[in-house]
UniProtKB/Swiss-Prot annotation:
Has been proposed to be a redox modulator. Its main location: membrane. This is Putative membrane-bound redox modulator Alx. The keyword DNA repair does not apply. Residues 1-6, 65-89, 135, 220-225, 283-286 are periplasmic. Pfam families: TerC (PF03741). NCBIfam families: R_switched_Alx (TIGR03718). It is found in: Cell inner membrane. It comes from the Bacteria. The gene is alx.
Length: 321
């Protein structure tokens, strides 16, 4: 697997992530179970985005010093494009979490605890998936066509799909978990497990955590191949992906109260997936530069938010009228 990642870059990335996670876990432990306010969520979102951009700037500077701008510029652009793709696709993941918490009636104060462990699990699972994907691509380059076709199909499916939280409890996976886990009927404070009559029982909070992890894996199956369309370098794919998901918890609390205001977002994300799928399928006939890919993804997101704002304005006007 060819990569620009050196021991210094890998080590620096690991240290930054470890420090930020330690700070996050320390704050979680000191404050206990409580809901993150909109102000706190906005502040933490800004912290994570700023940290990601600073890392990319340091990454670019390091490559300029060691490899020159001919290498540094496209690699930094690849990181930024991958980060933007993952960050935008992660919004759909956030909406699924919102449905899970709503269906299982998880109090806002406990949602943060679930997401702390959910993000930690996502880091481990995505790291495994990214290195596996990088190895597969290095051995079988034709697998990019499979990724492209899958993203094209997923984009069309996303545009046509309709999510309904009322059917979550009837999903085969949920029924299987409930049937095979010794589980209590109600949430017991912030505990994932409790002891009753000498036996260990999982609480519904543990079920929600499992579903949060599985939902992230499902979305990673979309988002990771999407970043491979930009670059196959495992260092850039992993760092851009993890920096994007590290801010997911703050993004959730930022968007949780206004989720219904983003009705058009899934269509924009669907267009992004279709574009990336086509990019992967035509790679042998026409190479779309990274800068163009970044511009297209950014442009689609901007247009989506403009259309969404217009739709909300029309709905609000009709409601008042």
């Amino acid at each position: 697997m060819n990569t620009v990642g050196t021991p210094l870059l890998w080590g620096g990335f690991a240290v930054v992530v470890a420090i930020m996670l330690a700070i996050d876990l320390l704050l979680q432990g000191r404050r206990g179970a409580h809901a993150m306010t909109m102000k706190q969520a906005a502040a933490w979102s800004l912290v994570w985005v700023t940290l990601s951009l600073l890392f990319n700037a340091a990454f670019w500077w390091y490559l300029v010093q060691t490899e020159g701008r001919a290498v540094a510029d496209p690699q930094a652009l690849a990181f930024l494009t991958g980060y933007l793709i993952e960050k935008s696709l992660a919004v759909d993941n956030v909406f699924v979490w919102l449905m899970l918490f709503s269906y299982f009636s998880v109090p806002a104060a406990l949602q943060r605890r679930v997401l702390v462990y959910g993000v930690l699990g996502a880091i481990v699972l995505r790291t495994i998936m990214i290195f596996t994907g990088s190895w597969l691509i290095s051995q079988f380059d034709w697998i990019l066509y499979i990724f492209g076709a899958f993203l094209l199909f997923t984009g069309v499916k996303m545009a046509l799909a309709h999510e309904d939280e009322s059917g979550i409890g009837d999903k085969p996976l949920v029924r299987w978990l409930r049937g095979h886990l010794r589980m209590t009927d109600t949430i017991d404070n912030e505990h994932f497990f409790v002891r009753k009559n000498g036996l260990l029982y999982a609480t519904p909070l543990m079920l929600v955590l499992i579903l949060v992890e599985l939902s992230d894996v499902i979305f990673a199956v979309d988002s990771i191949p999407a970043i491979f369309a930009v670059t196959t370098d495992p260092f850039i794919v992993l760092t851009s992906n993890l920096f994007a998901i590290l801010g997911l918890r703050a993004m959730y609390f930022l968007l949780a109260g206004v989720a219904e205001r983003f009705s058009m977002l899934k269509y924009g994300l669907a267009v992004i997936l279709v574009f990336i799928g086509i990019k992967m399928l035509i790679v042998d006939f026409y190479h779309i530069p990274i800068a163009v890919s970044l511009g297209v993804v950014f442009g689609i997101l901007v247009m989506t938010f403009i259309i969404n704002a217009w739709v909300n304005y029309r709905h609000d006007k009709q409601r008042v009228g």
